[in-house]
């Protein structure tokens, strides 16, 4: 994950042993980008999540990682270039699969979302072609 920032040609540095141990372990949660499939409430009002909303399975079961932490929306915002409302969240590996359908609870209603990206790749211009042109 951070290997590109670490110079392993140096004989030793503070934290090297801990980093090498952690590097080989599977992560408890993966940063994911979610897109809101339908943000219309049961009363017909368009709702836009802001962050801190719980994320659940389609069966409304809470999503919990290997350390017992629940998955929540960490940040949210409108993506005009994509025409969607986008959410960020840390999800356990078994849910961090592109195309996975999940539910976000917001103001007492449940909204369908889809895992669009698992990892730190952006949704818009993932290869930086637009900025490099």
Question: Where are these predicted regions, by residue range?
Answer:
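Conserved, structured C-terminal
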Residues: 1-133
């Amino acid at each position: 994950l951070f290997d590109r920032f670490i110079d392993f040609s140096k004989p030793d540095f503070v934290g090297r042993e801990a980093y090498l141990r952690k590097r080989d372990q599977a992560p408890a949660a993966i940063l994911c980008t979610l897109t809101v499939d339908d943000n219309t409430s049961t009363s017909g009002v368009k709702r836009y999540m802001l962050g801190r909303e719980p994320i659940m399975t389609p069966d409304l079961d809470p999503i919990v990682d290997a350390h017992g932490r629940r998955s929540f929306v960490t940040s949210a915002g409108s993506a005009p270039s994509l025409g969607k409302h986008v959410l960020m969240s840390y999800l356990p590996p078994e849910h961090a699969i592109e195309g996975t359908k999940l539910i976000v609870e917001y103001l007492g209603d449940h909204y369908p979302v889809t895992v669009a990206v698992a990892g730190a790749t952006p949704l818009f211009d993932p290869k930086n072609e637009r900025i490099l042109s």
